[in-house]
């Protein structure tokens, strides 16, 4: 790796540690030319393939932005949005594929969002699933009610 200070084409790794709950590796490096130290962070690239076929890196910020629009006017704080984005990223990474269709990202958002805020879930689902009638909303509300009534095992 090039030194960011003197642009020497090599550096030596001094220390490596996992960060971000094992999703990244933080490396402390030293330049043999100028002697300065710097830190790098390595993560595995996860690409999202859009409907058009274009591929772009997965972005937690885009997940948060989309969910924030659905949560507008609701009592949902930034910590909850960040946690949801982390859950979505963990879910899509667990698929084990370096590329994932954007449709799968949307599906990964729905579950955690339903648990976070049902109104925001309905808003997001209505756009994501292209609701076109009141009946679409009614069906989704019935599904929400049924989900609420399923007993959870302790």
From Swiss-Prot:
Organism lineage: Bacteria, Bacillati, Actinomycetota, Actinomycetes, Mycobacteriales
InterPro entries in the record: ATP-cone_dom (IPR005144), NrdR-like_N (IPR055173), RNR_NrdR-like (IPR003796)
Entry keyword set: ATP-binding, DNA-binding, Metal-binding, Nucleotide-binding, Repressor, Transcription, Transcription regulation, Zinc, Zinc-finger
Gene Ontology biological process terms in this record: negative regulation of DNA-templated transcription
ATP-cone domain segment(s): 46-136
Cofactor list: Zn(2+)
Keyword Ligase appears in the UniProt entry: no
Molecular function GO labels: ATP binding; DNA binding; zinc ion binding
Protein name: Transcriptional repressor NrdR
PANTHER family recorded: TRANSCRIPTIONAL REPRESSOR NRDR
Zinc finger (unnamed) stretch: 3-34
Protein task: Negatively regulates transcription of bacterial ribonucleotide reductase nrd genes and operons by binding to NrdR-boxes.
Pfam families the record matches: ATP-cone (PF03477), Zn_ribbon_NrdR (PF22811)
Family: Belongs to the NrdR family.
Cofactor note: Binds 1 zinc ion.
Keyword ATP-binding: yes
Top-level division of the source organism's lineage: Bacteria
